[in-house]
A protein has these predicted regions:
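Conserved cytochrome P450 K-helix E-x-x-R motif and the immediately C-terminal K′/meander segment
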Residues: 59-74, 78, 310-350
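Cytochrome P450 catalytic-domain helical core, especially the substrate-recognition surface
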Residues: 2-4, 9-71, 117-245, 454-457
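Conserved cytochrome P450 K-helix/beta-meander segment immediately N-terminal to the heme-binding cysteine loop
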Residues: 109, 362-388
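Cytochrome P450 catalytic-core helices
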Residues: 277-304, 407-425
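Cytochrome P450 heme-thiolate "Cys pocket" and heme-binding signature region
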Residues: 384-445
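Conserved cytochrome P450 catalytic core segment spanning the I/J/K helices
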Residues: 226-283, 298
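Cytochrome P450 catalytic domain signature, combining two hallmark sequence patches
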Residues: 101-120
Length: 457
């Protein structure tokens, strides 16, 4: 078998040599891809999840069919660069690590955001960093990096955040009793998000996340959008919090971050909100489910977590294996199923000339679970993340110039919640069934997840 050795002595599968020449898929394969990937992608919800369709597609493990089809596609055309004919024109699927690296390292200067993303996100967060280009992108990136402390291992308010997280986890466990699931995590992370971004005074402000959620549900319709009835009230509330920032909150840092009139500070905040509530709640719940279903991993985590110890922000930062568990949940079931880009100019990709206005697709649901490339594709491998902090195969937090500005903060929050939950008890995963000795499913319905709490004594 072709392969290479990792620093830990484990073998990483290497696929047979493939051409880097762009191939054109036939009409039948384009239709199959649309039915297997795009239809479920749209029905599940591009910006926030639809419970019914999440249930349907998790039931048939639809992403497993996507992975199998993409492997067949790559084998049939013997290429990592394949054109598909989809609605709106040709789309280029990029499978190779070198191709993905090139695209992400040249985003958004050459590879801007696709129309699907820009149109939908503009409905609830116009002028946001993630859909910006040119000088506006540079200005907004600098602002986001300053507030989110992107270049620091631990955020300057990390101790204050940790104290609040401990209090909220204790409060949540007091309320939920023996069994808990998605609704409990949703409430917990909304309260955490509100206090991290807006301060203690906002802890019970359910109106703000509710309005954002409604606008994100509307955005799932993408091209049938008018101005939301929630928009003005939502941004009015954000301006209120910005005008009177609370100590130890992200809004308290906003006035001191580099900005111009074009930064549009209020439009940067919704992205922080949904990333810290629905997205991070989903990933943290899945990570706890994985830990609970893998006894060896749980015991390794608990070696670093003494139930009688009240850990500090530095301790949380040192829990690298626990953070790896969170990263594995993100890898195994990426909440961002794909990264879609559009070439703003002509570009050369792996020796191929790519015309301007070409849609480019990086398919996380495939790249993260490609067993022909990754020896651990369908297993739980937190140790992988102990040495590899950036790998262009895995783009749940993106990579390159547009890597998530809040990556370190999001991982810190999720790890802190997991550490506090595990310090306070043990948990049995009741639903879904995850077997540590078998390949993990490609779909995970967070809405149906149930855990049983066994309190610490």
């Amino acid at each position: 078998m072709n392969g290479s050795m990792t620093s830990a002595g484990e073998q990483v599968n290497q696929p047979e040599s493939r051409a880097s020449v762009v191939r054109n898929a036939d009409a039948g394969d384009s239709i199959k891809f649309a039915l297997l990937h795009f239809l479920p992608y749209l029905l599940r919800g591009v910006f926030t999840r639809n419970r019914f369709w999440t249930f349907v597609f998790a039931g048939i493990d639809s992403d497993a069919h996507v992975v199998k089809f993409c492997q067949q596609l790559r084998s049939k055309y013997r290429s990592d660069l394949i054109y598909l004919s989809l609605v709106g024109g040709k789309s280029l699927l990029v499978f190779s690590e070198s191709g993905i690296r090139h695209v992400l390292d040249h985003s958004p200067s050459i590879y801007g955001d696709a129309d699907l993303k820009s149109k939908g996100m503009s409905h609830f967060q116009p002028n946001a960093l993630t859909i910006s280009q040119g000088e506006e992108w540079i200005e907004r990136r600098l602002f986001n990096e300053a507030v989110l402390n992107s270049h620091r291992g631990v955020h300057e308010y990390s101790e204050a955040f940790l104290g609040m997280i401990k209090s909220e986890v204790e409060r949540s466990l007091r309320q939920i009793g023996k069994h808990f699931g998605w609704e409990d995590f949703d409430r917990l992370f909304k309260r955490i998000m509100l206090q991290i971004i807006f301060g203690a005074a906002a802890e019970s402000d359910s109106e703000l996340p509710d309005r954002l959620h409604k606008m994100m549900l509307e955005s799932n319709w993408i091209f049938l959008l008018g101005k939301s009835r929630e928009f003005d009230a939502f941004y009015g509330k954000i301006r209120h919090y910005l005008a009177s920032p609370q100590p130890d909150s992200l809004t308290a840092l906003c006035p001191h971050a580099p900005q111009t009139d074009g930064t549009r500070v209020e439009n940067q905040i919704p992205h922080w909100m949904f990333a810290m509530m629905e997205t991070l709640a989903t990933n943290t719940l899945r990570a706890l489910a994985l830990i609970s279903a893998h006894p060896a991993a749980e015991e390794r985590v608990r070696l670093n977590i003494n139930k009688n110890q009240s850990f500090s922000a530095a301790d949380i930062h040192s829990f690298t294996y626990l953070e790896g568990c969170l990263q594995e949940a993100m890898r195994l079931w990426p909440t961002t199923a794909m990264l879609a880009r559009k070439t703003l100019t002509e570009d050369e990709l792996c020796g191929n000339l790519i015309p301007a206005k070409t849609q480019v697709i990086i398919l996380n649901t495939f790249n993260h679970r490609d067993a022909e490339t990754l020896y651990f594709a369908d297993s739980f491998k937190p140790e992988w993340w102990l040495e590899r902090k950036a790998d262009y195969h895995f783009n749940h937090l993106s990579n390159g110039t547009q890597v998530c500005a809040g990556k370190n903060l999001a991982l810190y929050i999720g790890t802190a919640v997991l550490a506090e939950l595990l310090r306070r008890g043990r948990y049995k995963l009741r639903r879904p069934v995850l077997n540590s000795s078998r390949p993990l499913p490609h779909s995970f319905n967070e809405f149906q997840t149930r855990l049983e709490r066994i309190p610490a004594f």
